[in-house]
Design a protein with these regions (language model features):
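Non-heme di-metal
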Residues: 1-212
Length: 212
């Protein structure tokens, strides 16, 4: 990453995948029966309730990540990226290895979530229901006028790339120049009571945001 525009583009990509992953989790949650009113026994109703609670916690984490990515973008003078494609998402919008579709709650959906959230460097296979035969690669050649999409292995890989961009631009431009957005325009914890929401004012707080 050599320009502010390239960093903004990468943050928009991070926002889009967090938004889409969140939608997948929410769809899985709302596909579950609501309890005894939907014909479940009392025992199974409690089990389903615990599944919903666990999935909701994960979806809320995605909401936090989306909010923090918005704050990262705002901090460098851009606007939060909140648009996303409709489902089904066409090939090429995300890297080849990232398949995002709306599936009801199942073992496959759980395995898919684990695959999407896996740490960088961990080798896991996606659930077979989400693996599609595709053959495309997104590359971003140097020297182009406009930023373009490029591939990444994991969401953590994407954030690592963005943090390298923050570090490089902070060094080349200076933090005062890079972090030109007003903190008043960011989403504060008082406005979005999500766990881990914080504002970004400099390189140190930017580096903490992806780990929240």
């Amino acid at each position: 990453i050599e320009t502010r525009e390239e960093l903004i583009y990468l943050l928009a990509e991070a926002a889009a995948i967090e938004h889409n992953v969140m939608c997948c989790y929410l769809y899985g949650i709302w596909s579950l029966k609501r309890g005894e009113q939907d014909g479940l026994s009392a025992e199974y109703a409690e089990i389903v309730k615990s599944w919903k609670a666990a999935m909701t916690d994960v979806a809320v984490e995605e909401m936090t990540h989306l909010t923090l990515v918005g704050n990262l973008a705002t901090a460098i003078g851009a606007a939060p990226h909140l648009s996303r494609p409709n489902f089904p998402i066409p090939p090429g919008y995300h890297p080849e290895g990232v398949s995002l579709e709306l599936f009801g709650f199942s073992h496959a959906l759980i395995d898919h979530g684990i695959f999407l959230e896996r740490p960088e460097g961990v080798a896991l296979k996606d659930a077979s229901e989400f693996v599609h035969p595709t053959d495309y690669h997104r590359t971003a050649p140097k020297g182009t006028i406009m930023p373009s999409a490029q591939d990444y292995e994991t969401i953590g890989h994407l954030y690592r790339g963005s943090m390298h961009g923050f570090e490089a631009l902070s060094h080349n431009l200076g933090e005062d120049v890079l972090f030109c957005g007003g903190v008043s325009a960011e989403t504060h914890a008082s406005a979005a009571p999500l766990p881990g929401v914080s504002v970004v004012t400099a390189l140190a707080s930017a580096a903490q945001a992806p780990d929240s």
